[in-house]
């Protein structure tokens, strides 16, 4: 029986997760009303006042870096949950649950994974390759994915 290479197993899980990432409509996530406006626009005469009014509203709906950061992390969490894999932070460490056990992830490998996933989601290439954007994704993950230690039971010894 061979030993399990946990680093390879973790990388395989992260690679599988990245492959499942599909483009995300960040505008519709950031502005839920955009979808309704797009439907209304499709039903308007192209040069009508109503169409122009809707187009102006849609043009004002700009997706910014905060939207990309927040929704990228939410989408990664959704995909991990869909596969029964956990991704979380506990005591400033990142952990990956593969369905059987938790193991600690390398920070640099995880940041690289976040950037790859963001690129596949449709984050502009300049952002998805920029190290500062990777840091922001990582920081958002660290804030959003905190796993609190279970409360001590009064019946269990400390």
Provide a role label for each language-model segment.
Residues 2-158:
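Intein modules and their embedded homing endonuclease domains
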